[in-house]
Amino acid sequence: GRKAKQSSAFKAALEYFETGIALLKDDPWNVQYELCRNLHTEATEAAYLNGDFATMDKYYPIVLKNTRNLLEKVKPYEIRILAYKAENKLLDAIKTGLELLKQLGEDFPSNPTMVHVMVDLIKTKVKLSGKNNDKLKDLPAMTDETKMAAMRIMADIASSSYWATPTLFPLVIFRMVHLSLRYGNTAISAFAFATYGVIMCGVLGQMRNGYEFGKLGLILLEKYNAKEWK
């Protein structure tokens, strides 16, 4: 099934995974947990990639209900978010992402205003004060799995928030910068710092600052070989 998925044969992959699910023993979530979880998660993703959202929605809640820890829920949540984006249901994508982020310890205001944006902007500028690109590019690599998952989910909802809830968008970017400063850089930090630079240029008119953060984003892209963000 995974080989078929890697070959973009998503329909065949889904059939393989569903066959695997059908062959599981009785009470599989207890007696074959890892295999059962992997098959259901893979079936959820293969259905999404095949554009079969009805089948995806059959497996998605089963995975969420039966997974044993929060980090195991991240992948199915991501699939659901990406599916909402594919269906142009941006508010649903954002709602789903915020729901998981809260569980991951990253809460956001339900109705963000420009006051929230200005407060977080000031906090971000304070955290960045005295730190040039040389210091920022050499931050240690992020190792906290919960924060790494939060970074992925924030990246997943960033574009949706840009179009559907514009006051949330900068809050998401600022939070990604905060996490990078506190817990270290990931490939996604390249996106965070570069987009922060866009905000500096496009919103605040701070062209030199914005340009420097854009350069930092490119440096981190190369450092982490972040092909998905190029």
Q: Language model features by range: what are they?
A:
Residues 1-6, 38-49, 75-86, 118-127, ...:
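Tandem amphipathic alpha-helical repeat scaffolds
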Residues 2, 18-28, 60-65, 98-109, ...:
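Amphipathic alpha-helical segments of tetratricopeptide repeats
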Residues 8, 15, 54, 58, ...:
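Primarily a tetratricopeptide repeat
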Residues 8-40, 65-77, 101-116, 182-192:
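Short, charge-rich amphipathic alpha-helical segments embedded
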Residues 10, 53, 70, 90, ...:
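TPR-repeat structural position
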Residues 32-36, 73, 146, 150, ...:
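Residues that mark the junctions of alpha-helical repeat units in TPR/alpha-solenoid scaffolds
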Residues 49, 55-62, 70-104, 169:
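Compositionally biased, long intrinsically disordered regions
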Residues 85-174, 202-212:
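Amphipathic helix-loop-helix modules that constitute alpha-helical solenoid scaffolds
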